[in-house]
């Protein structure tokens, strides 16, 4: 399912991110949607991947659990509640940005292209983009990528209900992870230009080095030398610590519920109650060195976690990282893109100057930016 000191950034050509769009009222009496076309592109089951990622995270010096644990069906429902909370400023700012500039950044998407959205958890923003493309009479194949089949099914069905008479934009789903999508594109071969839509500051859930690697991986596939893939990326660059803490550690404990769902999902993956929620507490904090908000599971007492033939010792007060959200300044975003072989072509920011978008394009590593 992402940032700059001045605010979010959106990139087109190699990366672009956008959050929620204005609420859209569904039509009352449209015909029932046809079954959704979802292509399973997983290389292997996510359960196997997550099992080994859990072990790897617990073996690390600074323990962590994979953030993908948070994004099951229950997690997506909880995150939807977070998006609708007044404290969660990224949605409000990205909505404003989209309303103002959607026509501008969709101009970079040409008729005949494929548009892949990396994460399809919140579709109000997506509807605005697809509606703009439809009104521009651009033939575009929209593919929503997500790890949850149920979320894909529901999201795409709703999209088709919002665009019941679409004749230019086609809609389908891709079931898999970011890595699955990159591998699928390489193996299937690109016959048309691909634009990636990466909204909601999702790119900044990764460490900068990992974000660079993911961007480079996605952008290796070309339909032809003259049709380099591009991305539209939204990045949050807010540096108001008080506002950030309110958004990621809400008074109603919704943030804690969202993060603790990861423990329940981990137990499901491991096949036993390794993590007992009552033995843990939640902590969210701002990391000024990395310009990043971090959420942790904190052990209330010493304990041993037995997984297979391995035993992991956790002391009282020890933190296991659950998820991060970077708030990257403009120069940081530019640096990440350049390291991935991407040139930032254009950017926009919201009225407060702290949420933005960038338009980018792949360039030869030997070229200058």
From Swiss-Prot:
UniProt entry keywords in alphabetical sequence: Methyltransferase, S-adenosyl-L-methionine, Transferase
Record NCBIfam families: methyl_EasF
Signal peptide: none
Function per UniProt: N-methyltransferase; part of the gene cluster that mediates the biosynthesis of imizoquins A to D, tripeptide-derived alkaloids that serve a protective role against oxidative stress that are essential for normal germination. ImqB is a canonical three-module NRPS that assembles the tripeptide backbone of the imizoquins via condensation of Trp, Tyr, and Leu-derived precursors. N-methylation by imqF and phenol oxidation by imqC, followed by cyclization via the FAD-dependent oxidase imqH carry out the three-step transformation of L-tyrosine into tetrahydroisoquinoline.
Enzyme nomenclature, EC number: 2.1.1.-
InterPro entries to which the protein is assigned, alphabetical: EgtD_Methyltrsf_superfamily (IPR051128), MeTrfase_dom (IPR019257), MeTrfase_EgtD-like (IPR017804), SAM-dependent_MTases_sf (IPR029063), SAM_MeTrfase_EasF-type_put (IPR017805)
Presence of the UniProt keyword Methyltransferase in the record: yes
Top enzyme class: transferase
GO terms for MF: methyltransferase activity
Name of this protein: N-methyltransferase imqF
The protein's annotated pathway: Secondary metabolite biosynthesis
Coiled coil segments of this chain: none
Domain of life: Eukaryota
Alphabetical GO biological process terms: methylation
Induction section of the entry: Expression is down-regulated by ralstonins, lipopeptides produced by the plant pathogenic bacteria Ralstonia solanacearum. Expression is positively regulated by the imizoquins cluster-specific transcription regulator imqK.
Record lineage: Eukaryota, Fungi, Dikarya, Ascomycota, Pezizomycotina
Entry's family note: Belongs to the methyltransferase superfamily.
Segments traversing the membrane: none
């Amino acid at each position: 399912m992402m940032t700059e000191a001045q605010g979010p950034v959106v990139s087109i050509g190699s990366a672009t991110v956008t959050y929620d769009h204005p609420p859209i009222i569904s039509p009352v009496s449209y015909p029932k949607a046809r079954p959704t076309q979802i292509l399973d592109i997983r290389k292997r089951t996510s359960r196997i991947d997550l099992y080994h990622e859990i072990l790897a995270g617990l073996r690390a010096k600074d323990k962590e659990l994979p953030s993908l644990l948070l994004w099951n069906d229950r997690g997506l429902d909880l995150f939807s509640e977070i998006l609708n909370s007044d404290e969660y400023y990224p949605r409000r700012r990205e909505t404003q940005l989209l309303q103002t500039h959607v026509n501008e950044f969709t101009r970079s998407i040409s008729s005949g292209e494929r548009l892949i959205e990396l994460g399809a958890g919140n579709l109000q923003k997506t509807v605005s983009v697809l509606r703009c493309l439809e009104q521009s009479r651009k033939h575009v194949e929209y593919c929503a990528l997500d790890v949850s089949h149920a979320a894909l099914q529901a999201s795409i069905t709703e999209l088709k209900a919002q665009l019941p008479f679409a004749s230019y934009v086609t809609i389908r789903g891709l079931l898999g992870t970011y890595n699955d999508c990159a591998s699928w594109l390489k193996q299937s071969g690109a016959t048309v230009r691909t634009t990636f839509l990466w909204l909601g500051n999702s790119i900044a859930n990764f460490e900068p080095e990992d974000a660079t690697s993911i961007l480079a991986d996605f952008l290796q596939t070309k339909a032809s030398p003259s049709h380099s893939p591009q991305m539209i990326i939204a990045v949050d660059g807010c540096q108001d610590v008080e506002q950030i803490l309110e958004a990621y550690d809400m008074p109603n404990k919704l943030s804690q519920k969202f993060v603790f769902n990861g423990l329940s999902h981990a137990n499901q993956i491991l096949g036993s109650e390794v993590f007992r929620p009552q033995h843990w507490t939640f902590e969210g904090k701002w990391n000024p060195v990395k310009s990043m908000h971090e959420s942790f599971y904190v052990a209330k007492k010493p304990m041993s976690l037995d997984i297979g033939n391995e035993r992991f010792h956790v002391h009282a007060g020890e933190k296991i990282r659950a998820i991060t959200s970077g708030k990257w300044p403009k120069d940081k975003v530019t640096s990440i893109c350049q390291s991935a072989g991407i040139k930032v072509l254009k950017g926009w920011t919201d009225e407060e100057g702290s949420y933005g978008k960038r338009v980018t394009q792949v360039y030869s590593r030997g070229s200058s930016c």
